[in-house]
Amino acid sequence: ARTDADAADLLTSDIDDRDKKFVTGERTSEGFFQVNCGVEQGIDRGLSYAPYADLIWMETSNPDLEYARKFAEGIHAKFPGKMLAYNCSPSFNWAAKLTVPEMETFREELAKMGYKFQFITLAGFHALNTAMFELALAYKERGMAGYSELQEREFALQAKGFRAVKHQSFVGTGYFDAVQTVVTAGNSSTTALAGSTEAEQFH
């Protein structure tokens, strides 16, 4: 369960008695109720969710271990060992907030506090857009040599377990070829991998 973010200072309703200690009595022009936000509110909501949720998560505004520790201690004081979640957010400017050694151990330090599920929201979005921008720029400036450089990086990464060089095999084409071969008793002429450029050029 995700509590309010530590910066969430608005509620749509003040009906819940558990919120009343944080409600300021002020309302916005849209009708929202203003609240005193922060880690105490996050802990309070987390404790309300804890009996029912597998994981408790409060969205934070900075990668701050002491802040994370305060939330963890607040939850564990009443629910020892309760598993916590932490968003290692791409909205944080990591290098501006932490040193390289701090970043290298950030994950492990969180784990010691009980943050068992750690994730980077939108990591794929940023990786995809950065990679495609770099590829488009290389292709613009160097033509197919720019793409070939990407391909050579793929080849080198195979030693570390990268498998998407052979994109047809990677997405399961071989499986569907096998199914088709069984269904047609070996007489299919439209399987994909046999005789393909992938089979001939990528070994």
Each PLM stretch: what is its role?
Residues 120-125:
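Short acidic/histidine-rich active-site segments
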Residues 1-119, 132-133, 137, 176-203:
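Alpha/beta enzyme core
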Residues 129-145:
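C-terminal helical cap(s) of enzyme catalytic domains, especially alpha/beta-barrels
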